[in-house]
Amino acid sequence: MAQRQSGYQRQPDDVYETPTWVTQIIAPYCRHVWDPANGPASRLAQSLRQTGFEVVATNDDFLARASLPHDRIDAICTNPPYGNGGRLACQFITHALELTPTVAMLLRVDFDSGKARTNLFRDCEHFVHKIVLLDRIVWFEREDASGP
């Protein structure tokens, strides 16, 4: 399925801040998290902290990391960069699962439906469930935007 052009200019380094309400949906699933795709001041890291998470947020080369930042991390939670065709997001998911079995990724609703990704979802022993957001995430500041 082809993606439509949004009409918005692409953000530098693909930085699209995650709204607070999205973070609160994953709150019951983990407490000590690492967000490897944002700096400490990111909205996702701040929202996780406000919800009661202990958060390590980094923005270095995640794919080059051989281990978790410390042994108290029980999950990797991030809005990964997508890259062309979602390839970079797939690399993020694969590497995150190599580091820890508990991973929460903010992805397009249809991201798990591709045949090339069955190893990450259908055939992955760690895949428990998919949380589908009923409200659309607004990634850009807009006056006419709706949502929580």
Model region roles, listed by residue range:
Residues 1-148:
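Class I S-adenosyl-L-methionine-dependent methyltransferase catalytic core
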